[in-house]
Curated annotation (Swiss-Prot):
It comes from the Bacteria. This is Threonine--tRNA ligase. Pfam families: HGTP_anticodon (PF03129), tRNA-synt_2b (PF00587), tRNA_SAD (PF07973). Catalyzes the attachment of threonine to tRNA(Thr) in a two-step reaction: L-threonine is first activated by ATP to form Thr-AMP and then transferred to the acceptor end of tRNA(Thr). Also edits incorrectly charged L-seryl-tRNA(Thr). NCBIfam families: thrS. It is found in: Cytoplasm. Keywords: Aminoacyl-tRNA synthetase, ATP-binding, Cytoplasm, Ligase, Metal-binding, Nucleotide-binding, Protein biosynthesis, RNA-binding, tRNA-binding, Zinc. Its cofactor is Zn(2+).
Length: 603
């Protein structure tokens, strides 16, 4: 499998979670920032200030929101503190001593934090000038922070404890690195990420919208965006047909009882939309309907609708099913975090003996999908059980068999993988695909889950060869994960430049004058009859402007038509991938376009 290649002119950036030194730098820098804020704004009250994967933040209770000018002043004060080379001192104190100190400086948020933490109670001091409750880790001195490798980035509102009913605070985000070069590379990537932001490109390319009357987290797909969705769905459906999957369709709502039996109501109720009941009595007895958060209980009902034999298995049911999660409004973000999304869901019902082969087939399908989407830099996370824990259901033998099937699949396919003991769900191990994009950000795409729980909860059975009734094993799988999230990631990965087979408009014909429009229209008709998505620019603009407009819309292929092309029955081709290709006969263009689309190639 392909590995991530970092070009010589870029700098590899360490991750906070993988670098103890970077964790200390960011944690200590957050304390330096809090000290600077309280020096400049004496009435500011501090709350929490952790490190993050890209930096750090601190939440403050202040009378007025911070401004850009405030951030500059805070940064300047931070540099002064760093240059004082203050020692960072860890102190362990009693809960009563901590309470007395906090009360003496009148910091109510710290008192609330104190009530929620376990002993030992630790305090970190910056010299003898500032302190905060903290578990660490930290640097030994502010001198260990490079003032040229830190930056304050933005301010946002945040509720205390994430509760909208509590005080609204001001959160300052910052970043800190080991060297100025790392900071510069991070800022370069961040700027590039803004250019690739799927929310920005989605609007510019006319792919999807959000509308206030509809509500947050509920995207509306335009014709162009719908084309991309449809192509992705059709592609996966064809791959599934080759592998013996059977299509099903299930409703968007169901009785609460279904999700009580599956366990979703007990475990995920806070993430589900409120129940719909026809009467107060139904509401009181929880007898109403809910929007489905998952598709699996529906597929189980289809399995249970008739007696199954071992000869019927494996049974592979597949659906592009829309599910609903009541995400908090502050957690929503473009297409990657929404309230209604479509999952390429499939549930395989297999005998224990079929688990290896079926799991391998599912992984092979996901690799086929990734190859077609040109997603090369990924690794597999094997989420296994912790052998010391007793939270898991199922026998040791069943778990070893399932984990062995996952391990053998990734090894046979020569995948880059790592094992994560203790990360399995209580009902079975799973395989997650972690994709690294062009900016070296990680996303989870595609998952395969072995499940012993739901067959037990729903009492699923099949008649074995010896006539006995046996329990099948379920495999949940979703190569895309969710269509919305996948498309958001693809927009950013491609920077809006979709490959020819996925592009909403594949070819735009540009006639240098209106007299050549009939010829252009005839070519479009030929292309459309072959299933190609083509259109004519009828704006009447000059050729240069038509080319610029097509480039802005990231049309993969432009075909210029003038007198010479009409006479030769040819097209002057320009592609985004290869530039100007010159005059090519129409028949050759059509053949090349068809072959490129069929092979998911570039031209």
């Amino acid at each position: 499998m392909a590995k991530t290649v970092v070009s010589p002119d870029t700098i590899a950036l360490p991750r906070t979670s993988e670098s103890e030194q970077l964790k200390k730098i960011r944690h200590t820098t957050s304390h330096v920032m809090a000290m600077a804020v309280q020096k400049l704004f004496p009435k500011a009250q501090v709350t929490i200030g952790p490190w993050t994967e890209t930096g750090f933040y601190y939440d403050f209770d202040v009378a007025e929101p911070f401004t850009e000018a405030d951030l500059k002043a805070i940064k300047k004060e931070m540099v002064k503190i760093i240059n004082k080379k203050l020692p960072v001192i860890r102190e362990e104190i009693s809960r009563e001593e901590a309470k007395q100190r906090i009360e003496s400086i009148q910091e109510p948020y710290k008192l609330e934090i104190l009530d929620s933490i376990h002993e030992p109670i630790t305090v970190y001091h910056l010299g003898d000038q500032w302190w905060d409750l903290c578990a660490g880790p930290h640097l030994e001195s502010t001198a260990d922070i490079n003032p040229k490798a830190i930056a304050l980035e933005s301010v946002a509102g945040a509720y205390w404890r994430g509760d909208a009913n509590k005080a609204q605070l001001q959160r300052i985000y910052g970043t800190a690195w080991e060297t100025p070069e790392q900071l510069a590379e991070y800022q370069r990537r961040k700027e590039e990420a803004l250019k690739r932001d799927h929310r920005k490109l989605g609007k510019e390319l006319g792919l999807f919208i959000f509308a206030d009357p509809v509500g947050p987290g509920l995207p509306l797909w335009t014709p162009k965006g719908t084309i991309i969705r449809t192509i992705l769905e059709d592609f996966l459906k064809q791959e599934q047909i080759k592998r013996g999957y059977l299509p099903v369709v299930t409703p968007h709502i169901a009785r609460v009882d279904l999700f009580k039996q599956s366990g979703h109501w007990q475990k995920y109720q806070e993430d589900m939309f409120p129940m719909m009941a026809e009467s107060p009595e139904e509401a009181a007895q929880e007898m109403g309907f809910v929007l489905k958060p998952m598709n699996c209980p529906f597929h189980i009902q289809i399995y249970k609708s008739e007696l199954r034999s071992y000869r019927d298995l494996p049974l592979r049911l597949a659906e592009f099913g829309t599910v609903y999660r009541y995400e908090q409004s502050g957690e929503l973000g473009g297409l990657t975090r929404v309230r209604g999304f479509t999952v390429d869901d499939s549930h395989l019902f297999v005998t224990p003996d079929q688990l290896d082969e079926e799991f391998l087939s599912v992984v092979d399908l996901i690799l086929t999908v990734f190859k077609s989407l040109q997603l090369k830099n990924f690794k597999a996370r094997l989420s296994f059980r912790d052998p010391e824990s007793d939270k898991y259901i199922g026998s040791d033998e069943a778990w070893e068999k399932a984990q062995g099937a996952i391990r053998r699949a990734v090894q046979e396919l020569e995948m880059d993988y790592f094992e994560a003991p203790g990360e399995a769900a209580f009902y079975g191990p799973k395989l997650d695909f972690i994709f690294q994009d062009a900016l070296e950000r990680e996303w989870q795409l595609g998952t395969v889950q072995v499940d012993y729980n739901l067959p037990e909860r729903f009492d699923l059975e099949y008649i074995a060869a010896d006539g006995s009734r046996q329990r099948p094993v379920m495999i949940h799988r979703a190569p895309f994960g969710s269509l919305e999230r996948l498309i958001g990631i693809l927009i950013e990965e491609y920077a809006g430049d979709f490959p020819l087979w996925l592009a909403p408009i594949q070819v735009r014909l540009l006639a240098v004058s209106d007299e050549f429009l009939p010829f252009a229209q005839s070519i479009v008709q030929q292309m459309q009859s072959l299933g190609l998505r083509a259109e004519v620019d009828t704006s009447g603009d000059r050729l240069g402007k038509m080319i610029r407009n097509a480039e802005k819309q990231k049309i993969p292929v432009m075909a210029v038509i003038g007198a010479k092309e009409v006479e030769a029955n040819a097209l002057n081709i320009r592609t985004r991938a290869s530039g100007e290709l010159g005059e090519i006969p129409v028949t050759e263009v059509l053949e090349k376009l068809q072959a490129t689309v069929t092979n998911h190639d570039t031209w």
